C-alpha cells in the first residue's frame, strides 16, 4: 500500500505543477495582453510555400488590423467580420469572412484565453511565453502557436496551421504599443461599377 501511495504521488504531483504553471502563464499573458490597446511595428511572414514577405502592421482593439506589405501590390485590413485584401490605394480587391479566426479573438477588447482557445500547452522560457492552442467552437481543426515577450507581453510571433496542416508564420519586431493609431488607417474604399 505504501509503494502504491508513493507511486500515485509521484505520478500525480508533476501534473498538478504543470496545470498550476499553465494557469499562471495564461493569467500573465491575458492580463498583460488586455492592457495593450494598440500595437504597431514591422513584420516578416513566411507562408506555407516558404515565401518571405515583409512590411508594417497595425493593431487597434477591438478587432482592427492592417498589414502593409513592402514587396506586394496588396495589403490586408481586418475588422470583426472580414479580412479584406486591398490595393495600395485602399480599394477592396476581395474579402473573406473571419468568424472563428485567431486574429479576431486576439484583437478582442478583453481576451479570455481559456474561453476562446483549447490550450495544448503553455510554456515559459528565458525570454518569452509560448502557447499552442486550437480555437474553441471552430468548424476547422486549425491550430495556432503564439509567442509573447515575457517582460512586455507583446505578441512576437504567431504560427497558424490550417486544417491541411499548412503553416503561416509571422514575426513582429520594432514594436510600439499603446500609441495613437487613427481609425482612418483601416478605411476600405470601393470602386464604382
Where are these regions (language model features)?
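Positively charged n-region of N-terminal signal peptides that target proteins for export
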Residues: 1-4
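Bacterial N-terminal signal peptides
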Residues: 7-14
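Sec/Tat signal peptide C-region and signal peptidase I cleavage site
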Residues: 15-20
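A short, Trp-centered hydrophobic/proline-enriched beta-strand micro-motif
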Residues: 31-50
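One face of beta-strands
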Residues: 39-43, 53-57, 65-67
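Beta-turn initiation residues at beta-strand->coil junctions
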Residues: 45, 69-70, 88, 159-162
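An acidic-aromatic
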Residues: 57-105, 168
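Gly/Pro-enriched, hydrophobic low-complexity segments
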Residues: 114-193
Amino acid at each position: 500500500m505504501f509503494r502504491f501511495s508513493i507511486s500515485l504521488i509521484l505520478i500525480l504531483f508533476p501534473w498538478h505543477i504543470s496545470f498550476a504553471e499553465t494557469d499562471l502563464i495564461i493569467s500573465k499573458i491575458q492580463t498583460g495582453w488586455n492592457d495593450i490597446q494598440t500595437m504597431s511595428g514591422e513584420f516578416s511572414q513566411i507562408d506555407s510555400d516558404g515565401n518571405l514577405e515583409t512590411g508594417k502592421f497595425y493593431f487597434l482593439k477591438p478587432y482592427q488590423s492592417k498589414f502593409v506589405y513592402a514587396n506586394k501590390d496588396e495589403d490586408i485590413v481586418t475588422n470583426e467580420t472580414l479580412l479584406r485584401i486591398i490595393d495600395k490605394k485602399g480599394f477592396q480587391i476581395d474579402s473573406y469572412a473571419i468568424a472563428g479566426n485567431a486574429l479576431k479573438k486576439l484583437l478582442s477588447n478583453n481576451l479570455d484565453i481559456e474561453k476562446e482557445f483549447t490550450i495544448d500547452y503553455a510554456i515559459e522560457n528565458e525570454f518569452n511565453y509560448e502557447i499552442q492552442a486550437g480555437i474553441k467552437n471552430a468548424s476547422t481543426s486549425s491550430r495556432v502557436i503564439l509567442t509573447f515577450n515575457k517582460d512586455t507581453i507583446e505578441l512576437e510571433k504567431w504560427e497558424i496551421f490550417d486544417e491541411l496542416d499548412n503553416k503561416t508564420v509571422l514575426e513582429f519586431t520594432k514594436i510600439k504599443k499603446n500609441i495613437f493609431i487613427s481609425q482612418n488607417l483601416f478605411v476600405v474604399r470601393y470602386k464604382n461599377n
